[in-house]
Amino acid sequence: MQRIKFICSLTVLAATLYGQFRYNHPEINWQTFDTDHFQIHFYEGTESSAREGAYVAEQIFPHVTALYDYEPQTKTDIIFTDFDDFSNGAAYYYDNKIIIWASPLDFELRGSHRWLQNVITHEFAHIVSLQKSMKAGMKFPGAYFQWIEYEDEKRPDVLYGFPQKLVSYPLPGAVVPPWLAEGSAQYMFEGADWDHWDSHRDMILRDRALNDNLLSFTEMNTFGKKGIGNESTYNSGFALCSFIAENYGADALKQIMVELSNPLQFSIDKAIEKATGVSGYELYDNFKISI
């Protein structure tokens, strides 16, 4: 019993220490207001961005949700912050939450865009498309199938022996590859131009094509690259999603997400084939030829 208490104490202590690694700002007085489809959270320094962002969010809501034929079950939280010298956006699709850093980002590899319109549409497209692709809803982000085998125990006072085999197989609740997640979020919806294909993006893709260095279909499925590699996952994903929309209709992006929501579907190659009639690898080859 003492041993169990000790282990529990270590667990609680570890959780407490982990919490100390993060930081907050207790001096900030957060405020919230509601729109038809969003809860907007801000403080004095971000109120202007929050009110403009709320307008943008409501303007793009019908377009993004119509593309995927899906609306979040509850109002999506959008948090506007500007604590640090930092620009970004993040979508937590299992929490139905978006964080927006209010400072505009002018990224050399993507040209100039209107920041709030771009980042809010991008992150909300993540929320909608990835929730559409979930296999078991928002309450079950994943599971493990596990099997344990124990040694035979000879002593009658011991219930079972020491574990000698462990099989653990993950069952993710969402299996959208990075190129599709980011590519569809940059595509946004038909007619959107907040994150358009500009000369900067074209330069990156053209350079890879001319040097026979296009990311393969497999390479597009992962991040963790060096140099411009991670940006090329975004860039190639945007180009491929645009190719899909142009050749099979924007609805094909939704159909791919629908196929990936099938609890037994874990192959992007097969999901694309179900949605478009051609396999993912064949579609990629056609995309490569078009470049």
Put a short name on every predicted segment.
Residues 19-170:
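Juxtacatalytic substrate-recognition/specificity segment
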Residues 25, 95, 115-119, 131-291:
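Acidic/His/Gly-enriched intrinsically disordered linker/tail segments
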Residues 1-24:
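Bacterial Sec-dependent N-terminal signal peptides
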Residues 13-16, 69, 190, 246:
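Residue-level marker of positions within ordered structural domains that often coincide
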Residues 14-17, 113, 257:
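Generic low-complexity, intrinsically disordered sequence content enriched
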